[in-house]
Structure formats: structure tokens, C-alpha cells
Amino acid sequence: MNQAEKAELLEQLEQWNKKDEYSRCIRAIEAIPEQERGYLLTVKLSRAYSNLAVLGDHGEHGTDGEVDGDLIRHAIELLESVRAQGENDPYWNARMGYSCLMAYSSATTACEYAKRWLALAPDDPDAQKLVRDCEEYLEEGKALELDLKEREEIIRKETPDDVKKRGGICK
């Protein structure tokens, strides 16, 4: 693939991405032999898999929050395959941050990539937003954890001693 063909493909991928046609992006990139794709097309392929996993073509997943775990894990594997080239690339860190957040519901892991993205592109409002979102998820997780501990403590205090001696309510 020469430079003009690659530029044309990249433009077409952007158009399909804007139209939520992620499967078309995947088919077009996967039609190119893996050893000829290079870094940028591998990252674009990962983006297409990630978007398909989370949004579906033409938003078919809607807002149900359901994520195709196999597709999102494949997106991460693709990013891992070009980690050496991507670690200092804001775009690679962005894709890894979003994918990890969706794959594992892990704001901790996603936040690491988001902060790296922000360090590499401090003026990028999307990087700033992902860091804020991850930090909010982490705070919500801590609050939920505390809430569960508080509830458990209340239940222990309110459970009569004879029930405790029998080993609990459900025995």
C-alpha cells in the first residue's frame, strides 16, 4: 500500500467512524495483511473493535451499557501488540484508557492511561475529561465500598445474639 492509498484509507476510516460503521472499518483494515498494517492502522483497528464493542454499528447498543467483552479484549490485545510504539503516543494512551475502562470497569487501570495521555497532551480536553471521569468512578467505588461496610456493621449490630450463635439468619 503506497502513501496515497494509505491516506485515502485513513480518510475513509474517519468517515465510517463518524457514521458509526465500525464493522466496515474492521473489514477494510483486516483486508490488509497484518504485517503490512503498521502502527497507525493497528491502533485504528483497535478503535473500531472498541467502538463496536461498546456502541455497536449505528448505535445498536444504545445506552444499555452492555459491552461485548470479547471484542473489547481484542481491542486491548491489538493495542498491546504495538505498545512499544504507542507508550509515548497520546492517541495510543487514549485508546488504552477508554478500552480498559470498558473492558474491566477498572477506573484504576484506565486512570493510569488517562493520566499518561494528559501528560503527553496537557491541553487536550478529552484527556482532561477522561481523567476526571476515572477519578469520579474511583471516588464512587470508594463510597460504595464504605457504604457496604457500614451496612454490614449495622446488620451485625442489629442481629440478635441468639442468631449470631447459630451462625446467622440463613442457617
Language-model segments: what does each one mean?
Residues 64-76, 107-126, 132-139, 146-158:
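TPR/TPR-like (Sel1-like) alpha-helical repeat modules
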Residues 50-81, 101-102, 109-110:
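Short coil/linker segments at helix-helix boundaries
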Residues 24-25, 58, 110, 143-147:
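Solenoid-repeat scaffolds in large eukaryotic assemblies
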Residues 3-7, 23, 69, 73, ...:
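Amphipathic alpha-helical repeat elements characteristic of tetratricopeptide repeat
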Residues 31-32, 81-82, 116-117:
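Canonical positions in the second alpha-helix
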Residues 2-11, 35-61, 87-102, 125-137, ...:
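Amphipathic alpha-helical repeat scaffolds of TPR domains
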Residues 1-25:
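N-terminal leader/linker segments that initiate helical-solenoid repeat arrays
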Residues 20-24, 105, 122:
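Short helix-adjacent coil turns
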